[in-house]
Amino acid sequence: MPPGIPRGAMCVQRFDDSRNSAIHITYRISLRSSSMREPRDPLLKVFNILKFPVTKILVFDKNLMNR
């Protein structure tokens, strides 16, 4: 990303139907708090869970713990 543009900025491009057919570029700054995680982080975790499922399940028996 070019220097001077905030990390949370998003580049949106659309074609103008005018004679010039100019491309308008708009930077939108997200209003989310800097302390919140990026939205792609939870998606990556879900992907990892689905791609690499856990094959072992641990079961604890309370009766065995008291012996």
Curated annotation (Swiss-Prot):
Remarks, miscellaneous: Encoded on the antisense strand of the nuclear 35S rDNA.
Protein name per its UniProtKB record: Putative uncharacterized protein ART3
Species whose genome carries this gene: Saccharomyces cerevisiae (strain ATCC 204508 / S288c) (Baker's yeast)
Gene: ART3
